[in-house]
Amino acid sequence: MVQKYQSPVRVYKYPFELIMAAYERRFPTCPLIPMFVGSDTVNEFKSEDGAIHVIERRCKLDVDAPRLLKKIAGVDYVYFVQKNSLNSRERTLHIEAYNETFSNRVIINEHCCYTVHPENEDWTCFEQSASLDIKSFFGFESTVEKIAMKQYTSNIKKGKEIIEYYLRQLEEEGITFVPRWSPPSITTSSETSSSSSKKQAASMAVVIPEAALKEGLSGDALSSPSAPEPVVGTPDDKLDADYIKRYLGDLTPLQESCLIRLRQWLQETHKGKIPKDEHILRFLRARDFNIDKAREIMCQSLTWRKQHQVDYILETWTPPQVLQDYYAGGWHHHDKDGRPLYVLRLGQMDTKGLVRALGEEALLRYVLSINEEGLRRCEENTKVFGRPISSWTCLVDLEGLNMRHLWRPGVKALLRIIEVVEANYPETLGRLLILRAPRVFPVLWTLVSPFIDDNTRRKFLIYAGNDYQGPGGLLDYIDKEIIPDFLSGECMCEVPEGGLVPKSLYRTAEELENEDLKLWTETIYQSASVFKGAPHEILIQIVDASSVITWDFDVCKGDIVFNIYHSKRSPQPPKKDSLGAHSITSPGGNNVQLIDKVWQLGRDYSMVESPLICKEGESVQGSHVTRWPGFYILQWKFHSMPACAASSLPRVDDVLASLQVSSHKCKVMYYTEVIGSEDFRGSMTSLESSHSGFSQLSAATTSSSQSHSSSMISR
């Protein structure tokens, strides 16, 4: 398996030329990198004007590997070839490196780049990417992979320290300014200004106190005090190391790489409508930074959010008065770590009464609104406390818990709520404090614990009786000033006290069922299943030419081909496919065919858009300006891989998928809308669907389009 690494953008608050002067001091050897034994220049080229300088070195490394492995391999040192291409005119340095030793067994490629910061020409950006592919290594492939990744990540951590070390060294030598490259023709005319600049730089070096030099200045301390400090931004919306540390926390190099790679994949497939970085990080943490697993559950969650309009729940849904009066839970300040604190007096809550009065779906929706509010409060606290806060603390008081709370429908509703929250809000619970647990609690815990993720379970702290008042209790996690009054604290807690829900508020099963349907059908999106040989099609009748058909769909599972057809004939009434084996008529499995099998393309109907292949996880928005009235058919068709793939060997994942029946099933979630010609005034912005479901978890929204003669399709 190929291991990949992608670094965030590292920002040095120094001019490019000064960074280059520091970088060159790493050769031919670097005492700060013990494994870097030495290097020899193999080839060197300089342009006549001095703007281009290309140098190729052969580097000798002493890899920290087991002695037995070195003996088996028959080598003591590993050799790499490094090619540095400096363009002083463009102020860029590109570094390419690959292994020379065991190149037929192990393939290592690295690319680094130094460029000028896009918002401050006196700052320098650094990026790094690498790949490792071990073909074979005497049966020690796994061991070599671990050693290589360990060595590489340790050197990544030292990279910034090394540059700053040589910057301090230059400072101690009085070198604080390196002039920019200029064409030879104007060098003579600018000698005077250049010399004055050097004098000014020398005077700047004198200003720095000698004591400060002895103590050693950090990179930030050495930056010019007069230099402007805009918000650190990077080209193409890339993440920089300072931003990650400030808003996301301390991550290892491999964790940073996973975040950046998953983020890049989302940008490619969702075209800017991606979740915020902290939300992506939550899914990665929930799957131990396994990119494939995190991507799978994140795509499922994004589809779920879009289908049920969860992004707008705080603005569009008001909790019923019964919840406001009898749901004994609410937000209450924050804990010692700055996490928002949610208090739930479960023992005082009439779970049976709430379920009978509201139904399971209303309770679920209320819990979702609590989680959405928690995400918002985490963002606010991150700004207030100046450090990353991505989770909240929940305090559950169980005083009053009894067998009434073990009512079977109530427990069933609780288990479903846990399942939905675990799937869509991973790593949002920082700590759960369970206080005054009664004897009946172990029974409830036995029912609930199997549905709780192991990582979440480790965050639970359970106190029986008044144990929470002793050592290791509540005071270790919450300041004394904000402990609620019902726990013998000094702070008034405005959480409702709960109590029994009056039976007059109970509703019949039919009323609750209708209410549940109403809650979860409040979505503009529809779901459909697509099978091999059984596409899903919808019919749109256009009366006036020049109308605009818009669409917005997500490919939830599998790969599909999207087509648009026009016909003057009316298709037969829509009929569900009768392939019972696929359970097409089940909820979320709608499948309809409209094009009769006897119809011929070009005679009975025509294609008005080029087929668009859409991969799993992609979000597609687009529109088509109709040329003729009649019947338009939007079709989602199963996409089969060509028999002769580009690669000689198929991927293992593809082989395994082909063995499963479900591999011939795709799922899409779509919304369509028709804009009348009188409402369309020729503006391209009018082509965008007004109901396109953009997630509020998104950090940015951009678009890219693929235009045809009369349509615009954007992914």
Curated annotation (Swiss-Prot):
Gene symbol of the encoding locus: SEC14L1
One Pfam family, short name: CRAL_TRIO
PROSITE patterns: CRAL_TRIO, GOLD, PRELI_MSF1
Residue ranges of domain GOLD in the record: 521-674
Location of Phosphoserine modifications: S586
Residues annotated as domain CRAL-TRIO: 319-495
Recorded GO CC terms: cytoplasm; cytosol; Golgi apparatus; nucleoplasm
InterPro entries: CRAL-TRIO_dom, CRAL-TRIO_dom_sf, CRAL/TRIO_N_dom, CRAL/TRIO_N_dom_sf, GOLD_dom, GOLD_dom_sf, PRELI/MSF1_dom, SEC14/CRAL-TRIO_domain
Summary of the tissues where the protein is detected: Ubiquitous.
Subunit structure of this chain's protein: Interacts with RIGI (via tandem CARD domain); the interaction is direct. Interacts (via GOLD domain) with SLC18A3; the interaction is direct. Interacts with SLC5A7 (via GOLD domain); the interaction is direct.
Protein name: SEC14-like protein 1
Biological role: May play a role in innate immunity by inhibiting the antiviral RIG-I signaling pathway. In this pathway, functions as a negative regulator of RIGI, the cytoplasmic sensor of viral nucleic acids. Prevents the interaction of RIGI with MAVS/IPS1, an important step in signal propagation. May also regulate the SLC18A3 and SLC5A7 cholinergic transporters.
Region (Required for interaction and inhibitory function toward RIGI): 1-510
UniProt GO BP: choline transport; innate immune response; negative regulation of cytoplasmic pattern recognition receptor signaling pathway; negative regulation of RIG-I signaling pathway
Cited SMART domains: CRAL_TRIO_N, SEC14
Subcellular location: Cytoplasm; Golgi apparatus
Chain ranges of the PRELI/MSF1 domain: 1-175
Keyword entries, A-Z: Cytoplasm, Golgi apparatus, Immunity, Innate immunity, Phosphoprotein, Signal transduction inhibitor
GO MF: protein sequestering activity; RIG-I binding
Residues bearing PTM Phosphothreonine: T234
Transmembrane annotation, as ranges: none
Domain of life, source organism: Eukaryota
